[in-house]
Amino acid sequence: MIIPWQELDADTLNNLLEHFVLQEGTEYGEHDVSLADKVADVRTQLQQGLAVIVYSELHESVNIVPKATLDRAQVDDIPE
């Protein structure tokens, strides 16, 4: 289930973004990037519709995924 980021409380969204960034350990190359900048990058991706927040009832977990990945997964689930 997709959770619209706009419907989350600002503190909840920020905590989710920080948790995601810390969990992912995204590599930014040779340059050190601050936690605030990483959070801002993911927030921008949400605002631009490039990423979405997904809740899994099965795993009772929340994740942030690229929208393109989600679109491909939905197409793959369509029976032929």
Curated annotation (Swiss-Prot):
Q: What is this protein called?
A: UPF0270 protein AHA_0994
User: What InterPro entries does the annotation carry?
Assistant: UPF0270, YehU-like_sf
NCBIfam families attached here?
A: PRK04966.1 (NF003438)
Per its UniProt entry, which superkingdom is the organism in?
Bacteria
Family, as annotated:
Belongs to the UPF0270 family.
Organism name: Aeromonas hydrophila subsp. hydrophila (strain ATCC 7966 / DSM 30187 / BCRC 13018 / CCUG 14551 / JCM 1027 / KCTC 2358 / NCIMB 9240 / NCTC 8049)
